[in-house]
From Swiss-Prot:
GO terms for molecular function: NADH dehydrogenase (ubiquinone) activity; NADH:ubiquinone reductase (non-electrogenic) activity; quinone binding. The chain crosses the membrane at residues 7-27, 61-81, 88-108. Its main location: membrane. Signal peptide: none annotated. Disulfide bonds: none annotated. It comes from Psychrobacter sp. (strain PRwf-1). Keywords: Cell inner membrane, Cell membrane, Membrane, NAD, Quinone, Translocase, Transmembrane, Transmembrane helix, Transport, Ubiquinone. NDH-1 shuttles electrons from NADH, via FMN and iron-sulfur (Fe-S) centers, to quinones in the respiratory chain. The immediate electron acceptor for the enzyme in this species is believed to be ubiquinone. Couples the redox reaction to proton translocation (for every two electrons transferred, four hydrogen ions are translocated across the cytoplasmic membrane), and thus conserves the redox energy in a proton gradient. It catalyses: a quinone + NADH + 5 H(+)(in) = a quinol + NAD(+) + 4 H(+)(out). The gene is nuoA. This is NADH-quinone oxidoreductase subunit A.
Length: 211
């Protein structure tokens, strides 16, 4: 029985050594060889490495690790109390309560120091809220339509962006009133036509007098 176990262990060791030799020798004999600087470069998963291998970690990781060790070891003492809660009685309960309160005070102190704050100090400052004062104007009075008498013209004689159409308002207000009054005659086809009734009436009177 002992000899059979020894032979099986020896066979396993020889098989493991043979497998290692096979994996090292056969690829060297069958694989191709090439020389160059690119072959000597260090790469990880087919990607050429860049930068330094030493990464600068934030000090916050160090603080969190220290706090974890401290509170973890302190919480380990509570395990001893939990398995012997009946034996220690109320005295043990009061001792554990004081211990927990001490842990909470330490945690509050660490929070007050900002040890667990990951954001920079300037981002944690409360920004002043901008309060917009109500507008001191009446929107209805601004958007109401002004009559032709109230429109102000620019130097070219046009109303700048205050009328819906490009009405040419010159300094002769009376002529423009007469012209706008003529734009209310609609013919039988439904199209709006501009007819100067004063001119038409003058022409008709002249025709009658000539006849």
């Amino acid at each position: 029985m002992t000899s059979a176990f020894n032979w099986s262990a020896l066979a396993f060791i020889l098989a493991a050594i043979g497998l290692v030799i096979f994996m090292l020798v056969v690829p060297r004999l069958l694989g191709g060889r090439s020389q160059g600087t690119e072959k000597e470069e260090v790469f990880e998963s087919g990607v050429v490495g860049a930068g330094n291998a030493r990464i600068r970690l934030s000090a916050k990781f160090y603080l969190v690790a220290i706090f974890f060790v401290i509170f973890d070891l302190e919480a380990l003492y509570l395990y001893a109390y939990s398995v012997s809660v009946r034996e220690v009685g109320w005295i043990g309960y009061a001792t554990a309560l004081i211990f927990v309160v001490d842990l909470l005070i330490g945690l509050i102190y660490a929070l007050s120091l900002g040890a667990l704050n990951w954001a920079p100090a300037d981002k944690r400052r409360k920004k002043e809220r901008l309060s917009a004062a109500p507008a001191g104007f009446n929107l209805a009075s601004i958007t109401k339509f002004n009559g032709i008498d109230e429109l102000h013209t620019d130097p070219t004689g046009k109303v700048p962006a205050q009328s819906s159409g490009q009405v040419n308002v010159s300094n002769d207000i009376e002529a423009n009133k007469r012209h706008l009054a003529n734009i209310d005659r609609i013919n039988v086809t439904g199209n709006v036509t501009s007819v100067d009734f004063s001119t038409q009436s003058t022409n008709s009177l002249s025709n009658k007098s000539s006849s």
